[in-house]
């Protein structure tokens, strides 16, 4: 649907010995991670394990103090092709006041357009398609603040999809979303992965996304303690009750529809 290239066994994300401190306290301790083209990888772990910190560090929303990150083979500090990446933040982040659904989704095209120019046919088609995918086409002119939490999350997913990303990074996309919508998301992500896109997703429980996932990387106290097949649901519960990692308002994020503007 969004990506037309065939999967290749090339590294889309590579992180080596990544260390992050926040407020002088260690949050990530020597993280190594690989995500390949056409691969779906879950990040899992208990309270404060560093899942959200890791994904934000990988796309330069948070600085890391040590280590190396490469996106599509390019060192993070030199990476500029942000239109290749879509990012869906945690639903609990406040939404933009006064913004309508279609406006939020349209912002996902900014990295693929020249500033101040009107939407092209390709932009309008991508926006319309993304709204259809999340089943919110009939809410295009609705203000974000009037939507339920699950609907707001679906809008943020549509914004990322509108940019036609090759790498989709999602932070708890199923939190507060009904089972039907979770299954629809799983079907969508499976289609993207089948077309060659890569997915890195933070999850509390795998749920309907289980068949999609190639691997689960489990974090504990800022370290990788497991990297392999997805564990059974009863084993994942052993990781403990989930609380969201560090949160930042959507309005403060230096990205637009998954494209980090630098």
Q: Where are the regions a protein language model picked out?
A:
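H-loop/switch region of ABC-family ATPase nucleotide-binding domains
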Residues: 203-204
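Conserved ABC ATPase signature
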Residues: 143-147, 151
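Conserved ABC transporter NBD signature motif
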Residues: 67-81
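H-loop (His-switch) and adjacent beta-strand-loop-beta switch element
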Residues: 216-229
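Conserved ABC ATPase "signature" region
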Residues: 121-139
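Catalytic Walker B motif of ABC-type/P-loop ATPase nucleotide-binding domains
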Residues: 168-171
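Conserved catalytic motifs of ABC-family nucleotide-binding domains
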Residues: 164
């Amino acid at each position: 649907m969004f990506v037309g290239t065939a999967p290749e066994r090339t590294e889309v994300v590579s992180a080596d010995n990544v260390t992050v401190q926040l407020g002088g306290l260690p949050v990530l301790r020597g993280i190594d991670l690989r995500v390949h083209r056409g691969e779906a990888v879950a990040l899992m772990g208990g309270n404060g394990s560093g899942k959200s910190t890791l994904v934000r560090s990988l796309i330069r929303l948070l600085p890391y103090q040590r280590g190396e990150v490469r996106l599509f083979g390019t060192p993070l500090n030199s990476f500029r092709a942000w239109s290749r990446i879509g990012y869906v933040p945690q639903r609990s982040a406040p939404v933009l006041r006064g913004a309508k659904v279609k406006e939020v989704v349209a912002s996902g095209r900014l990295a693929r357009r020249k500033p101040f120019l009107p939407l092209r046919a390709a932009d309008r088609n991508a926006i319309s398609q993304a709204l259809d995918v999340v089943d919110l086409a009939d809410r295009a002119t609705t203000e974000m603040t009037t939507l339920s939490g699950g609907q707001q999350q679906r809008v943020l997913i549509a914004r990322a999809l509108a940019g036609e990303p090759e790498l989709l990074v999602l932070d708890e996309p199923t939190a507060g979303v009904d089972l039907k919508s979770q299954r629809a998301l799983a079907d969508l992500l499976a289609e993207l992965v089948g077309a060659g896109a890569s997915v890195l997703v933070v999850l509390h429980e795998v749920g309907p996304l289980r068949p999609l996932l190639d691997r689960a990387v489990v974090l504990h106290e800022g370290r990788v303690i497991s990297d392999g097949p997805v564990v059974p649901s009863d084993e994942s519960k052993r990781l403990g009750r989930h609380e969201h990692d560090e949160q930042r308002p959507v309005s403060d994020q230096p990205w637009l529809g998954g494209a980090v503007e630098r």
